Each structure stands twice: as structure tokens, then as C-alpha cells.
Amino acid sequence: MIHPLPDSDCERVVSDLLAYMTVEEKAGQLAIVQAPDPQDRAETEAFARAIRDGRVTAVEGIGSKLQAEAFQQIAIEESRLGIPLLFPAETATGVDTIFPAPLAAAASFDMDAITAAEQVIADEAHSRGINWALGPAAGYLRLGRGASHPSSAEQVHLAARIAAARVMGLQAAADTSREGVLACLDLSRILAPSSTGGRQEIADALRIAAHVSQQGYLGSISFGGADARHRNALQRAFSFLQGPGAFEGMVLSEWQTLAAAARDSEHVEIGDYMPIDAIVAAIEKRQIPLSRLDDAAARVLRAKYALGLFSLPLGREAVRRRGSLPTPIQNRQAALDLAKKCCVLLRNEPAMLPLGVDSGDILVIGNSANDRFLPVAGRGGPGASVIDGLEQLGIPYKFAPGLALRRENGTVGRLVEADSMAIGMACEAAKRSRTVVVVLGECENGRLAEAEHQLLSSLRTVTERIVLVTLGTLPLDPVVSGGPLPAVLHAGQLGTMSGHAIAEILTGEAAPCGKLPVAIPASEHNRGLPFGHGLNYADFALTDLTLDLATDHIVASAQLRNTGEVSGVETVQLFVRRYRGRHLPSRMELRDFERVTLAPGERQTVRFELAREEVGEFREDGRLVAEGGTLDIRIGLSAGRTLGGEIELPDAVARAMGSFVKGLPGSAADSRRRA
């Protein structure tokens, strides 16, 4: 577990070290250096000298835990001040066990499952000597932007909640039995020069950073390579990070700024060689204030203290204290748990899922059903295929490829001559089957390729009992032969346990509870579905919306009832829009959500408290300000299925929202917790 900060003992250690450190050693606390080739003795010896001289703070690219411990021993026992090292690495969606990709995980809306997944990732990273994860990378997917980068959702609030859950998992914030690793909140995908880089992007990054930092200590934060045009705006907006008693973690953009100032250059990337001697010279010439270097070095020392490195055991004591880590079986179970919660049932009318006795003979169509590398998307592998999952459950099925094989790693695109025979064979097999399950892989830009569309169109001429399962990044709800398919399950890239999760959902061993983290826009290719849409094997109804104004917050509530015949999980979502004069924006902003489990016939009142974080907006100076005005507040099961009303927020209540604390005894949140 990462030690919470601030801490008086930590400040004493940091203060004492800074008093003894030379300017060169302080600059060395900002130097991330690539590990040497173990076979190159000269390079390894030179690297060891740099550690002894205090010119290295972090080592990238270590090959094993033993190598990390060897470097750590040099730093602690042979350097002048014995300051330990960090070992950073990209952990992404898994080290040994591959978890669902960012957009797939976002569909779960389950922060506990995401935190548990990151705890496993931290354990596996720690077993390799890594103690600093260069993630999570926060991002959102606006309509029309494509899915070329990892994204959490199209709604900033969901992206912020997921980022906080990932940080808590990596840093083992809720589990004292785990070591944890430092996390780094990476906002570069939002603030990159290639993006629009405007005021809205900065406000979104502020909302994410503020939400994550409110949950507890954050090891580090990175803004990436903002260009000169946006750098001043960023520095002004995020100035709160530098204030006394504010953010305690490492600010990697400050390292870049110091390096660029010392080199007299426009821009320096994280991971570039840190010009230690140039920084020393710039400070001696008073081109860089020593206080800036002291602050940056102090943040690194605090991070190392929080990680427990100043009391790090070495040698035999380290082996004795390592204890037992979760086994691969437990890790895979955590991956399976999250993967099942990521599946989104887009359509099921008539109710063809779950598969059962009435499903009759099952025909599985699509080469993607056999693909063990598609679910991990090049992040490791292999994972479990859909066929693997069905066979483990003992489900009898027949198989047809549906389309001709493409070259290795080739994507399905236009029809080829061999497709005609494959489609014909699939249609003949479909005539002799009661239920057809079609499994498709990556679909470019969220639409069917020509060959895939022809396959589904041909199948629909011989049967209506088609279940479509999609494994691509983006969800799709295709229009085939003039209308939507009866049953569509979007799984996405679910990682190591993908096939087992999908098979359990298809057969009813588990129930779907995922929600769309991005809307499917309506077009000639897709019927279109709203953000937050996702069906269940149970049925839910939302009624009795109430909006109440208190002295310092707003309470919105509605009653959720399970009208189905089985238990289920529903995600109730809160949306807010603010009138701009007489204009009401078409886009609703997600501001909160709650997952609720109900038995058949059971009902529960779901309450949301809205204060400054929910109704406020970030200003250019980084302040979150709530203003009076007319708000449109909606509670729903998706952005397209809501109950809503307008409420006038007085200026006095808006000003008082800054002092409201959620969850105090007697508050709505406290009542919900006790219910």
C-alpha cells in the first residue's frame, strides 16, 4: 500500500535530504535513464557509477526483479546519501494477465472491478521489479474522433471515475496487504498538440485531475508535450498543483520545463536525457531559481517515501518479506469478473438470449470465433476464444467460417471471390440450425465491411434467429436488409479471459450488465443507440423523479424497480444541462451514476446529491465555480431513456455549494449508504 501523504515524518526526511544534497544530486532526482545491456560490462559499470554519483532517479527497461534489486542495492548502499531508485514501466492493460481494453472496461461502469484489475496489474508489475506505472492514460472519445487511442468513454465524468479507480488499484489504496506501485495520471491524450488543445480540453483535463486527486495521494501526473501556444494556459489552469498543501505528487511537466530551460530549447519529451550539468549551470547563473529545482526534487523524494523505499529491505530480508502474491488462477478470475461486466447487450428482441433448450442446434459463424489473439489486440496472448469458452461450458455447436480466410493479420474488407462459396456454405448450415451466432472482429470506423454485410444479409434471407457478437473496439448496431438484427452483443477487446466471459453471457451463466460508454450515432450503416444503453436479462423501470433544493446542494431521486423474473444489475445515470440564456444544449453531461442490484419485484430509491462538482464549471485559472441559473436535471437508464425536470439554482445556493460535503450524517448519500 502506498503511504498516504502529507506525513510529518516524510517531510522531515525530505527536508533533511534536501539540506545535504548538492545541486547536481537534486537535478539527478529528475533523471530517468534506460537500463544498460546486461551483457555490456563497460556500459553496466558506467551506469553503476552514475547511480553512485546520484545522477539517476529512475531506471527504465529493467529485465527482471533481480536486476532491479541489484541497481537498488547500489543506490542505497554505495551512493553518498543512499536515495533509492524508481523503476518505471508502461503497464497498460496488464503485464502477464491481459485485462479488457480501456473502452471495453469503461462499459462495465464498475469501479470496484476496475480497481481489482489494477491491483492484479500492480502485483504482476511488482513481481518484475517495477514500482512506478506510467499510467493510467486518461482520455475520452468524442463522436467522430475514431478509436486510434485508448479511451475511457465519451463522457468526462466516467473517464474521471475510471482514472481514479485505476489509480486506487495500482497504488493499493484500499488494501494494506498489497505492495502497490506508484501511478502516473497521464493527461497527454487530452492535451496533446495534435488535439484541438482548446479551453474545453483544458477544462476536461482539470475535471479529471481534480477528481483523481480528491480520492487520495497520486504519485505523479503528466500533461505530455503541450506546445508553446497552450503551455501558458496550462500552467495557469493547473497552478493549483504547485500551491502549499495542494498536490503532493511528481509533476512530470515541470521536469520537462526545467530541462527545456536548461537546454534553451522549445520542448523536451519525458524520457529524454535529463541535462543535469546544464541544469546545474543554469542555476549557478540564476537562469533557473533553485527553489523550482528544490520543489521538483522534494516531490520525487516524497514519492519514494510514500512507496516505502527508504525502509526497503535488501538481500535475504527482501526475499523473506516478499510474501505470497495472488496466483495466476486468482489473477485470471479477476480478469474474468471484469470481462463479464463489460459485455453490452444492445438488442434482444425477440429474446434469443440467453441460449437455452429453445435455442436448438447452435451454429457459430465467423473466423473471429476461433481467434485467440483478437481479444488481446496485440497486448500479449493468447487469450481465450469464443469457441474455447463454449467448449469449456460443454455447449454443443457446429461451426462455419462464413468468409474466406484473409492473410495473417489481414482485416476483412471488400468481398473476394472465395467469399461466395464460404457464404453459401454458411447459409446452408444455417438452414439446418435453430440459432446462428455470428462473431465478427474489428470493424473499421464502427461499421460493417462489405464482406461482413453481405454475409449477414445472406444469412438473414434464410433465418431471423441471428445473434451477432462483436469483438472490435467500437460497438455497432448494424442495419441489415433494412433493419436491425434481433440480438446484438458487443464484447469488445476483453483480454485473456474474453471467450469464457462471452460464453457465460451467451448461455446465461452470467447476465449482461454493461452500458455503452460511447453512443452509436445513427447513420445508413447503424440504427444508432444512446450513451449508457445496455439491456439486461431482467427488466427495469424508473419512476417517481423528484428534485429538491437544499441550502447548499440539490437532491435528485427516482425509484428503480425490477419488473423482470430474474435478478439483475442496472446502472442509474445522472445527467445535467445548463441553459445558456434561452438555449438548452443538446448534449447532456453525465455527472454521476450508481450500479444497483435488485431481485425480481424489488425496488429501491436512488438518490444523487449535486454540489459544485456536478453543476460547476472550471475557469481558465483552474477554479471550479458554480453559478446560479436554470438547470435541466435528468435521471435515466441511458441518455435516451430519462426522467427529467428543470430547477432554478439561486446564486446563494450556488455560492454555498463549495462548502457542501457529501455523505455527512443525515445527508442523502449517507441515507443511500445505510439503505
Q: Where is each model-derived feature located?
A:
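N-terminal beta-rich core of secreted/periplasmic extracellular enzymes
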Residues: M1-D186, E201-D272, V280-L309, A335-A351, ...
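C-terminal non-catalytic regions of proteins with extracellular/luminal or membrane-system context
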Residues: M1-S8, R41, S127, R199-V212, ...
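Alpha-helix boundary/capping detector
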Residues: E43-T44, L85, S151, P326-I329, ...
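Feature marks short, surface-exposed loop/turn motifs that line or immediately flank catalytic pockets
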Residues: V95, L141, L191, D371, ...
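Short, contiguous strand/loop micro-motifs
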Residues: A107-F109, T196, E266, P326, ...
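Eukaryotic compositionally biased low-complexity/IDR segments
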Residues: S188, S194-R199
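Short helix-loop capping/hinge segments that flank enzyme active sites or metal/cofactor-binding pockets
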Residues: R299, L307-P313, E317, L440
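Flexible, acidic loop-helix segments that line cofactor/substrate-binding pockets
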Residues: S311-I329
